[in-house]
């Protein structure tokens, strides 16, 4: 399984080498958190990982357009970053559509509020990867929740 790291920190470029040494395969960082976006992407690639940019709900998806040809993936946040258990923001799905239209080769990931009742709308929008935290870890049977999530996404 790929080790996918989502850095929710300021100046992520400073920490790239440490995460690569720890075995990260994919490293996502917030476009809003780094002045040297291109340099950070290049550093991720140089250490052998795949670069990804994350976009907060209030940030225009067009902010990542200049970097699409250098990226493996874009992470569209479907909650405000910071804590688990927030409500899924379905109004982020147009960002997914814009990304798929502009760069069909790119993987699109969503993170935030993913559950059995929200994963289908993400799948319909064209999302490739859904991050499910609270719905899995607070479930009475996490294994069953994962199976239910997979089924709900496939039934689209």
Regions found by a protein language model. Give the residues of each.
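Glycine/Thr-rich beta-alpha phosphate-binding loop at enzyme active sites
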Residues: 57, 63-103, 107, 118, ...
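Conserved, mostly hydrophobic/aromatic
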Residues: 19, 74, 99, 111, ...
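C-terminal helical cap(s) of enzyme catalytic domains, especially alpha/beta-barrels
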Residues: 44, 123, 137-156
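Glycine-rich phosphate-binding active-site loops on the catalytic face of alpha/beta enzymes
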Residues: 27-35, 75-85, 125-145
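Hydrophobic faces of well-ordered beta-strands that scaffold small-molecule active sites
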Residues: 3-7, 27-29, 51-55, 74-76, ...
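Active-site beta-loop-alpha junctions enriched in small/polar residues
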Residues: 8-12, 32, 56-58, 79, ...
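Glycine/small-residue-rich loop that forms an oxyanion/phosphate-binding "nest" at active or ligand-binding sites
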Residues: 1-53
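Catalytic cores of alpha/beta
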Residues: 13-21, 59-71, 114-130
């Amino acid at each position: 399984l790929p080790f996918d790291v989502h850095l929710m920190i300021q100046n992520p470029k400073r920490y790239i080498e440490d995460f690569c040494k720890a075995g990260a395969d994919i490293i996502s960082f917030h476009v809003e958190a780094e002045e040297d976006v291109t340099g950070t992407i290049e550093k991720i690639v140089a250490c052998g990982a795949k670069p990804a940019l994350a976009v907060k709900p209030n940030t225009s998806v067009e902010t990542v357009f200049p970097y699409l040809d250098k990226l493996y993936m874009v992470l569209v946040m479907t909650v405000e970053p910071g804590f688990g258990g927030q409500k899924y923001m379905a109004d982020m799905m147009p960002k997914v559509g814009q990304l798929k239209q502009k760069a069909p080769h790119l993987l699109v990931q969503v993170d935030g509020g993913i559950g059995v009742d929200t994963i289908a709308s993400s799948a319909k929008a064209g999302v490739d990867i859904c991050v499910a935290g609270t719905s899995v870890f607070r479930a009475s049977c996490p294994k069953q929740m994962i199976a239910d999530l997979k089924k709900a996404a496939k039934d689209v």
